[in-house]
Amino acid sequence: MCEGEKQFSYFCMDYGKGKVIYMYVTHTFEPVCDEKSRILILGTFPSVKSRENAFYYGHPQNRFWKVLAALLDENIPSSIEEKKKMLLKHGIAIWDVISSCDIEGSSDSSIRNVTANDIAGLLAASRIEKIYGNGDKACRLYDRSEERR
């Protein structure tokens, strides 16, 4: 249940009499993790830029990779392979709470009709000890998915 990339699937839905276009989007790239991963950082759902780049935190203005590199005393990774290598070197896994949803652009506040990823399955197949959300929405969605189990 670790590594691998796929493409996203889309179809448009018009909610709100033509005012807002939500897209049904399926998250199709896998978590980054391995047998040494002890920390899991959960996001909500990839931004439009991340979906285009087929990897996490792909918008050039997103500070995730800069902050993480500073915390880990590493150079800022530029390629997907460098990002994966930095994460795994430090026992960090990343994934998103949401498997599919309706979303307007990249806005977490617009997310609706959520289907959660199988985080429990990832945890059972790994040695993750700590889970951190990268924001309030990710934490709330994770808590909600755990309550349903």
Language-model segment annotations:
Residues D143:
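Nucleic acid-binding interface residues in structured DNA/RNA-binding domains
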Residues K19-I21:
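Intrinsically disordered, compositionally biased low-complexity segments in eukaryotic proteins
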Residues M23-R140:
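A polyanion-binding, active-site-adjacent surface
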Residues E147-R148:
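Conserved small/polar residues in nucleotide/adenosyl-binding loops
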